[in-house]
Amino acid sequence: MELVVEPLNLHLNAETGSTLLDVLRSNEVPISYSCMSGRCGTCRCRVIAGHLRDNGPETGRPQAGKGAYVLACQAVLTEDCTIEIPESDEIVVHPARIVKGTVTAIDEATHDIRRLRIKLAKPLEFSPGQYATVQFTPECVRPYSMAGLPSDAEMEFQIRAVPGGHVSNYVFNELSVGASVRISGPLGTAYLRRTHTGPMLCVGGGTGLAPVLSIVRGALESGMSYPIHLYFGVRSEQDIYDEERLHALAARFPNLKVNVVVATGPAGPGHRSGLVTDLIGRDLPNLAGWRLHPVWRSGHGRGPEPARCSPRHSTRAHPCRCVLSQRRLSEGTMRTQFNPRIPSHE
């Protein structure tokens, strides 16, 4: 049978029963993938014509047809098919692994946010903006975005206290320096596109600052010189953290503009009052033609929830973060499963 891959206009021979990812990899077609078990959502692609058998963990229909999004590692070929994959400048392949680590610091960032630092036994490569699952105990496992870069001496996660949250309660009240943890990843498609040339808009609220900080640092330290507009939104002055780090970056890199926005109560010196989305609308009234990277918000469930970028979305009820950069429009999602099957153990 034939598999057509757009926008590359490739015509590939394939065997019935093969997964899309197997066929793409065997033909050296560039596509991002990570866990290879249908959990991370990295190998997402779209069906243009034909049907596939979808074995994904969340699928509600075994046959996926025109317009459906599937995971290449879980979609099985049953007939001639045409698919669309992300453009090659968005490809990243960091095979997911399990790496042991040791907690080296648990710092109080705010009254309800802890900054967790972990020293890994072995390096873990990831792209800025990706996330990993952290296993504190067999019963305490959650996904968190990396706040740093793979070149950092330690891995950093920012964890917010969730009322009634089993894992955050453990982190705040039981976890101690010296504890052993397991890091599974990297996962996710909301990573920095390094080949992009154009301005970026980055928005983070609460612990949504973590992946935004990773992306902004990755962009700046790799030499990207176009304007980067960073908006950090909080409910009140007591929720602000990492401000010194943000302004230190802005002092080093003049193309970075930092806005700290306080939604309720008086704003302190150098801060702005109101909703982040309203201020963005006034500061940047025309975002036509800007490129949209995956957008998500931190919910109170098991993991990141997909979210749409809209003027009134999620600034108060949920921390949110988004990254936009000028040019084309693309869209991605992050999976909500918190315990992916990772093939290798270290």
Curated annotation (Swiss-Prot):
Quaternary assembly: The 2,4-dinitrotoluene dioxygenase (DNTDO) multicomponent enzyme system is composed of an electron transfer component and a dioxygenase component (iron sulfur protein (ISP)). The electron transfer component is composed of a ferredoxin reductase (DntAa) and a ferredoxin (DntAb), and the dioxygenase component is formed of a large alpha subunit (DntAc) and a small beta subunit (DntAd).
E.C. designation(s): 1.18.1.3
Matching CDD domains: fer2, O2ase_reductase_like
Cofactor: record remark: Binds 1 2Fe-2S cluster.
Biological process per Gene Ontology, one example term: catabolic process
Stored Gene3D superfamilies: 3.10.20.30, Nucleotide-binding domain of ferredoxin-NADP reductase (FNR) module, Translation factors
Gene that this sequence comes from: dntAa
GO MF term (any one): FAD binding
Organism, as annotated: Burkholderia sp. (strain RASC)
UniProtKB keywords: 2Fe-2S, Aromatic hydrocarbons catabolism, FAD, Flavoprotein, Iron, Iron-sulfur, Metal-binding, NAD, Oxidoreductase
Protein function: Component of the 2,4-dinitrotoluene dioxygenase (DNTDO) multicomponent enzyme system which catalyzes the incorporation of both atoms of molecular oxygen into 2,4-dinitrotoluene (DNT) to form 4-methyl-5-nitrocatechol (MNC) and nitrite. Ferredoxin reductase catalyzes the transfer of electrons from NADH to ferredoxin (DntAb). Also able to convert naphthalene to cis-(1R,2S)-dihydroxy-1,2-dihydronaphthalene.
Highest rank taxon of the organism: Bacteria
Designated name of the protein: 2,4-dinitrotoluene dioxygenase system ferredoxin--NAD(+), reductase component
Uppermost EC category: oxidoreductase
Coiled coil ranges: none
Domain annotation 2Fe-2S ferredoxin-type: ranges: 1-89
Cofactor: [2Fe-2S] cluster; FAD
